[in-house]
């Protein structure tokens, strides 16, 4: 069971610690203070994960069991790599037998058992390179992609929803029957066409906000379970 972090740590730093730096902007100081006092950040450090985002995936899996039995996983928007760490462990991926392919336009340090591509996923060559690297049909496509924020809520929402749609189309093209798709989205409404497409192709579609996602954040996750297979999609188009 994924437990919420307790108010303490083994790093010698107490929760509630304040950041004192007069040269730092107030907003930056507040962000840093929140970050270093975040129990999920501290737990990630203790358990060897690259980011607190690991616990979002673990929480979702605890309820929906999307990692169980996964043999090949593709991770979109993977940097800094905490989801890829979990994926490599679950699949038993090694450098000799790669079963996890990850992509991000940001640089990402190497991980054992993970093939990493530094490239924008919107690049036309990205899907083919990922499929070649993962070495077979993936059981799970996970996406933590989000467009760089502009400060304009509607613009940020639309740009991130576009990434969700591209990731969803990719998942439908590559997943094996029974596979799952998980993507980050923002509160503010998921596009109807995207939801309709996912419901047409998957047996269960739900919105999820794990406890490890900050309460004040507009971040949510859209989970599509049980891919029906491309034959089902073709039948629907003919109908």
Curated annotation (Swiss-Prot):
Residues 11-20 have a biased composition (Basic residues). Gene3D superfamilies: Vaccinia Virus protein VP39. It is found in: Cytoplasm. It comes from the Bacteria. Keywords: Cytoplasm, Methyltransferase, rRNA processing, S-adenosyl-L-methionine, Transferase. One of its GO terms (cellular component) is cytoplasm. Its EC number is 2.1.1.166. It is an enzyme of class 2 (transferase). Residues 1-20 are annotated as: Disordered. The active site is at residue 184. This is Ribosomal RNA large subunit methyltransferase E. It comes from Rhizobium etli (strain ATCC 51251 / DSM 11541 / JCM 21823 / NBRC 15573 / CFN 42). The gene is rlmE.
């Amino acid at each position: 069971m994924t437990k919420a972090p307790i108010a303490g740590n083994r790093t010698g730093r107490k929760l509630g610690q304040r950041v004192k730096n007069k040269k730092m902007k107030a907003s930056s100081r507040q962000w840093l203070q929140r970050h270093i006092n975040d129990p999920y950040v501290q737990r990630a450090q203790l358990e060897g994960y690259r980011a607190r985002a690991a616990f979002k995936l673990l929480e979702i899996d605890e309820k929906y069991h999307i990692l169980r039995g996964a043999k090949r996983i593709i991770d979109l928007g993977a940097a800094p790599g905490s989801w890829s760490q979990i994926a490599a462990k679950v699949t038993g991926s090694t450098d000799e037998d790669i079963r996890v392919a990850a992509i991000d336009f940001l640089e990402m340090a190497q991980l054992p058992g993970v093939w990493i591509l530094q490239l924008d996923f919107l690049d036309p060559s990205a899907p083919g390179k990922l499929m070649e690297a993962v070495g077979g049909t993936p059981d799970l496509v996970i996406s933590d992609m989000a467009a760089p924020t502009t400060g304009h809520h509607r613009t940020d929402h639309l740009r991130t929803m576009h990434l969700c749609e591209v990731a969803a189309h990719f998942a439908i093209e590559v997943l094996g029957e029974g596979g799952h798709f998980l993507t980050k989205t923002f509160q503010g409404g998921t596009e109807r066409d995207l939801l309709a497409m996912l419901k047409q192709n998957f047996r269960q579609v739900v919105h999820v906000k794990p406890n490890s996602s900050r309460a004040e954040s507009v971040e949510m996750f859209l989970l599509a379970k049980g891919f029906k297979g491309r034959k089902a999609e073709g039948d629907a188009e003919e109908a």
